[in-house]
Each structure stands twice: as structure tokens, then as C-alpha cells.
Design a protein with these regions (language model features):
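Conserved catalytic/switch belt of AAA+ P-loop NTPases
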Residues: 292-304
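Conserved Walker
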Residues: 301-316, 330-336
Length: 400
């Protein structure tokens, strides 16, 4: 009998909500006894003498159950969901395969409420893997990045992924804030009538909005990452515009500052993958940093790095658009102006007319967001072959 991912996830949630402190399956050779914390797990040591009772060796008060196996469609790596009760409170941990097969790695989970010591870790490892073999966890295919992954397009929106055979799986708290910022409110009609109508005649704003939407098409047309920036000495409207064009995908929390490390920019670009990145205010960034960041980002791949196993980490790739703001243009800030300018589209004209009504527009895009981007990409997907043929037909030949 086949089950959908939704049916599987609902069953997992129902099991997690049950008021029981004992897993459904306990392997032979183990025993669970109730205590003031809920329950405790013991290993049964058979007696060697007739008539002598078996011994019970304590293992843990947080009896783990491995109920879900996550299979990464991109690299084949697996991880697991570990469920247990800590002082009668349910706990769910995303754990790596290494953490539940190596006693030293398992010990690190003590900081995440697992009751384990150096004396019990190896026994708990044995128990976990016996349980997993005799009661295999449900397998779910997952992606750990957004956008184009293998033959799938991974949305950050829960309702868009409900019927997908692949689920988004994230273990990073920093990225979780980004995921939570991808959400929608209102309707496409509301966005059109209350937001789009107010900006459709503003060229600089519309270029930024088109870049925000167009980011998800770079993979489709095999275009390398690039940056679109709104620059100018005036303080009017740059950050406002960045928040505005982020609203096609979600809330203003999608906007982050340039005050971050190159590694964090690279990690965010890799995670967003196809979706745009919004970076505000280059003012406090050094010319050397901005040049290196532009080159690293526009290369579309992470740097090669060695790991603790003395091997090379797998490179991550991305194809998206970064939208940026700053008083000085990135091109003028960088020492290598020619090299950087080939990777940056700079908009320096005033984005809004004098006495523009920012207050009402700010209210509208904070109340209506996250609808245009979804519908834009759905429309493209519905007729992608026609759109690609049209682009090939209208593109100039190499001789032109």
C-alpha cells in the first residue's frame, strides 16, 4: 500500500502528540519502567545461573525513537528525526547518521536534552540501531535548498509543497528565519490594485521589481548570477524600494544588511539558490570586501574547502539575482572597476518623484505580499517552452 508524504507527515504528528512516554516498539533484551520523569530504559542482562533473576542495567530516561529518515535528493546523504520525552515534554531532534552511530557524536546531544553519559552512550547507540533495524523509520525525500534542485523546484511556502514528493528540510536556525519570511498575505488582485498600480510608472522601481521576479528564471535560461543595485547620495527611497520589491516573495524580513561575512553571503546565496537575495546599505563595507564579495557571488559556486575528515566539501552552486542598495555604487567602490562593472547593473536615477506618498505605499506592501512571485513563476512554468522559443527567436544573432 502506498502513502503520500502528507499522510506520512500527519501520522508522524499524531504519534508525536500521543501522551505516552514509551516507543511503540522495544527490541528484545530491553525493558521500560515508569518513573517520576515518565519512563526509563533498561538493558536486560540474562542471568547465568538457574533461579537467579536477570539483571537490569540503566540506559536513559529519554527513550529515543527514530521515526523518520530524510534522504537528500541532491547528494544522497541521510539524516533522521529523533523523538523522545524529556521530563514528560516531547522533543524532536534532527540528527545526522553519524550522531546515532558513533558514541562520541551521540554525547554531544546531551546539550539538546538527550539523557546520555560517557558510560551509557555505547549502550544507547546499540539500542537506537536495533530499534531502527527492527522498526524501520519512514523515508522522506528532502531538499535542503530552495529553487531548482535536480528535477524539482523547491518552494519555501508550505502550501506550495503540500503535494510535492520532496519536502524542504532545514536544520539551520538562521535560514529558518528566511524561510519564515517567505509567506503570503492578501490576493494577487489586492497586490495589483494596492501596490503595483502605485509603482508601474516608476522606471527605477520597476527594474528592481523585474529583477526580483526574474531571479527564478536564471536557471531556466542558464544565466550566471549578477547584481542589480539602486545607488545614490540621496537617502530617499533606496531601502524602501528594497523592502518593496522583496514583497513579491514575502515580508520585509527577507531584506538583510551587507554587514556580514563573505562566507555568510555565500551560504545565503547557496541556500536561496534560485530566489533573489536582498542586501541593504553598502556604506560600512570596505572596497576590498565588496569587490571580493561580488566576484565570489557572481561566480555562482562556493569555494573549495577542506573539512575535518581531510577531504574537500562538495561545492554548492546557485543562479540568482542579488538586489542591493548603497550611497555609492558598487562599481565606484571597488578598485577593479572594469571587472566589477561587468557583474553589476547600477541604477542611479531618483526612484521617486518629489513629495511622493511613501506612507500609504508602505502600508499596502506590508499588508499585501508574497503573491506576485508565486503566480509569476507558475505562469512561466505553464508555458515555458513558448517563452523559451520566443526568447530564442527575438535574441540577436552572434553577427548582430
Amino acid at each position: 500500500m502506498n502513502f503520500t508524504n502528507d499522510e506520512i507527515m500527519n501520522e508522524i504528528k499524531e504519534n508525536m502528540n500521543k501522551k505516552t512516554y514509551t516507543p511503540d516498539f522495544i527490541p528484545d533484551g530491553y525493558k521500560v519502567k515508569p518513573n517520576s520523569y515518565g519512563a526509563a530504559l533498561y538493558q536486560i542482562i540474562p542471568s547465568r545461573k538457574d533461579g537467579e533473576p536477570d539483571k537490569e542495567r540503566f540506559i536513559t530516561t529519554t527513550i529515543p525513537e527514530i521515526n523518520t529518515r530524510y534522504e537528500n535528493i541532491e547528494n544522497g546523504e541521510v539524516s533522521y528525526n529523533m523523538h523522545f520525552f524529556d521530563n514528560r515534554t516531547p522533543v524532536n531532534l534532527n540528527v545526522t547518521a553519524e550522531e546515532i552511530t558513533d558514541s562520541k557524536q551521540l554525547l554531544k546531544l546531551v546539550n539538546r536534552k538527550l539523557d546520555v553519559t560517557s558510560n551509557t552512550s555505547s549502550k544507547l547507540i546499540d539500542y537506537i540501531n536495533q530499534s531502527k533495524r527492527y522498526s524501520p523509520p519512514i523515508n522522506i525525500k528532502v531538499a535542503t535548498r530552495l529553487g531548482h534542485v535536480k528535477d524539482y523546484f523547491i518552494y519555501p511556502y508550505k502550501d506550495q509543497m503540500e503535494n510535492s514528493n520532496v519536502k524542504l528540510h532545514n536544520n539551520d536556525r538562521g535560514f529558518q528565519k528566511l524561510i519564515n519570511s517567505f509567506k503570503s498575505k492578501g490576493t494577487l488582485s489586492d497586490y495589483s490594485e494596492k501596490v503595483f498600480v502605485k509603482i508601474k510608472d516608476l522606471p527605477m522601481v520597476m527594474v528592481m521589481l523585474y529583477a526580483s521576479l526574474g531571479s527564478v528564471l536564471l536557471y531556466e535560461f542558464d544565466i550566471m548570477p549578477f547584481i542589480v543595485e539602486l545607488a545614490g547620495s540621496t537617502s530617499t527611497g533606496k531601502t524602501f524600494t528594497l523592502n518593496l520589491v522583496a514583497s513579491v516573495w514575502g515580508t520585509t524580513d527577507l531584506t538583510t544588511t551587507w554587514s556580514s561575512t563573505r562566507n555568510s553571503i555565500e551560504a545565503m546565496a547557496s541556500f536561496l539558490n534560485s530566489f533573489p537575495m536582498f542586501k541593504d546599505d553598502t556604506r560600512n563595507i570596505s572596497p576590498n570586501f565588496i569587490a571580493n564579495a561580488v566576484y565570489n557571488y557572481s561566480s555562482g559556486e562556493s569555494k573549495s574547502r577542506s573539512n575535518k575528515n581531510l577531504t574537500i566539501d562538495e561545492k554548492k552552486e546557485w543562479k540568482n539575482i542579488m538586489l542591493s542598495t548603497g550611497e555609492a555604487s558598487i562599481t565606484n567602490m571597488a578598485e577593479d572597476k572594469a571587472g566589477v562593472s561587468a557583474r553589476v547593473v547600477t541604477l542611479e536615477e531618483q526612484p521617486y518623484p518629489d513629495n511622493y506618498d511613501f506612507i500609504s505605499l508602505d502600508h499596502e506592501f506590508r499588508e499585501n505580499y508574497g503573491t506576485l512571485g508565486i503566480e509569476f513563476f507558475k505562469q512561466y512554468q505553464s508555458k515555458k517552452d513558448k517563452y523559451k522559443d520566443c526568447l530564442l527567436y527575438t535574441s540577436p544573432s552572434p553577427r548582430d
